[in-house]
């Protein structure tokens, strides 16, 4: 869920309290115009609202300030409530993932991507050695103290690789299905482009839910429930949304 979407609706009210219902009073308060110069308005309003402080000495890793973190925790509480209501159970996976798991994912992603581009069944193709997935976007841990690690590790950019390593150990028969878990953790991605609070950062306050099902029908029901969850959350946050299905070219392989 985008932190940006959740916060933007409430920023003007918090920062511009007492200025009336009109546009930001640029001359009176020194606030850039959101309409005329969004690129100037956005960082100003994030700082003025005391959501996060971007001056931490690592680019793209902002410090949550009390007001911003309080708002985020309230949003998290709504999410926890929806997960409990729909039978999801909370887990917490390790921050570090061994390199060999990433290699497996990269090979699979490369094969699925090529199958999609060529319009063939992925089973007809062999795994390729080309780099894909998150390999170029992760933070690596290759030393422990003064010793080189036998197997390098990386900070999770997301948790599919870690979770799906454990799922086969937890699911022994159809009686263990459906499996519905979620977690709220920090993830890390080495963004090389210009960072901007909530829009593109290197440390992300991240919510993810993962499920496993006995058949396609049950998986489809889960998708429908997911849409209902989003509707309920956005309604509680007073945020209008448009639900759309991604085209094939824009989906993760």
Give residue ranges: language-model regions.
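TRNA-recognition modules of translation machinery and tRNA-sensing kinases, especially anticodon-binding
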Residues: 2-253
